[in-house]
Amino acid sequence: MGIKGLTKFIADAAPNAIKEIKIENLMGRVVAIDASMSLYQFIIAIRDSEQYGNLTNESGETTSHISGLMSRSIKLMENGLKPIYVFDGAPPELKGSELEKRGEKRQKAEELLKKAKEEGNLEEIKKQSGRTVRVTKKQNEEAKKLLTLMGIPVVEAPCEAESQCAFLTKYNLAHATATEDADALVFGTKILIRNLNANASSTSQNKNKNSSKRGYILTEINLEQVLKGLNLNMNEFIDFCILCGCDYCDTIKGIGSKTAYNLIKEYNSIEKIIENIDKNKYQIPSNFRFVEARDSFINPKVLSKEEIKIDWGEPKIEELKNFLIKDYNFNEVRVTNYINRLLKARKVTTQRRLDNFFTACTKKSTKLVNEESQIKKEVKPKRKGKKRDAPNDSSTKLNSKQNKKPKGEKESKTEKDDGDTHNGNDNEEEGGEGETADMGAKDPFDTEEDEDNPSVNFFHHKSDSESGNVKKESTEQEANATPTGDVYSFPNGKDASGSNIHLSSNSTLHSCNNLNGDKAINESMHVVGSSAPEAGNNEIGNGDLFTSNAADCVNNNTDKTQAEIEMKKKNISFLLPYCPKNVTSVKKRKSVQRC
């Protein structure tokens, strides 16, 4: 059931927290999916067109869930989304009363369904058949086996799937939770995605309005914006949801979402509401277990981050064929088509989001600034503040004024090495399908760290002091200014040259300890007003993502215009790893700094 009336209330009271997105917006994202909810939707959606019964094999076993799960998973991957399916464990004891009520409703629906079949009322048959559906343990096990054979990760929650999904987002192992149960927000999921399985199959009799010409539309709810829009902290939000009505306890009769919100705003907690409420007007249940319900939301039974294993395995093609064709009598041609789509879809997930490709231009390190200051003292420029044509040109002029110091010879060699590196990248781009640039890129489904290919190689460029690209600043004050805005550092909060990063109070440090695949997202950090960030401050903002293979955008012919649009939105200069040839500077904006 989730939280009664929560989505509608949020839409009215905190409209900025809800927005419509297209499935394409989730490209490159890892999404934790409530598997039981998905299977339920597939069984309802994929039915016999005449009697609205489940699809079955020759033995009479239901196959709707298998067909829907396979088709939908491939479709998600074809759009670049990386799904993790989370299955329910044992239901919590507090939910016993709610489960009994659901059982009674299902029994009543079965009686009405039987009557509708006797009367031949197809509309009533369709209505009641959906209410009698339940996902069995056997169907869950079949779904797990199918996903494993497809190479898609499965997580078995010790209790509720939506709470485990929420904690996957808290652990930064997933971007969002996909479920229709709004209580995922109460468990603390950062982002909730609804309608992910809308129009689950082309065989469904009802085309969802969201699958219109304008695209496959999803609903995204952002928890941070919910709290901001309602002006509640998380504890107040949890108590508000309990008062609205949840699965874990009864609620106070006569209190709906609007009244609950007003009471929470006035008294801040359920305890104080009970103390001050008009007992004649509102009847409090004799067994109002709100304290236990609150604890279930705050401290749910979930796997810890260390206990979770996300296994992006290779598809087991032959076993998958046998499972579908021999065990469940799927058409061989149809299965072959699914497998071909699956293999192609895995390649789509290697394409990174455009905002992953661009990273804000790295600010100069203290070490580099000091070196430049020393140069300025030794060599006075002809015109103070004169704009240099390019870093290489300026460094060449400086070296000529220093009477060919030994350092200049070393720098020339470094520049040559950099040129070779780019040539090597170009050769990789010209290679066959599936080849990647030499930057430590891995199979997107491989999450293990490559010790032989440190994450720092992702950028594959040397600091200005190492490469000879020493750039003069117009004034001494500018050269020694504390960097503000977005500062991107290498491991341990250091910059490209190995010096510590010094931040202003308005700075945000992105400490990239591991830039291989999704771990880059997991280990990115926002550290505001601190020059000594600690691991664990994992607050990921929109667009603060990285790619382990910047050449993907080049290999896939990134649209120049679209790239410039994204850059204009950020209104900053960028550092482009491997400097793609088909992306140029944005006019009337700060120029793109080449590698």
From Swiss-Prot:
- The protein's organism comes out as Plasmodium knowlesi (strain H)
Q: Which family does it belong to?
A: Belongs to the XPG/RAD2 endonuclease family. FEN1 subfamily.
Q: What class of enzyme is it?
A: hydrolase
This chain belongs to the protein called Flap endonuclease 1
Q: Which domain of life is it from?
A: Eukaryota
Record's keyword annotation contains Acyltransferase: no
Per its UniProt record, what HAMAP family does this chain match? Fen
Where is this protein primarily located?
A: nucleus
Q: Which CDD domains match?
A: H3TH_FEN1-Euk, PIN_FEN1
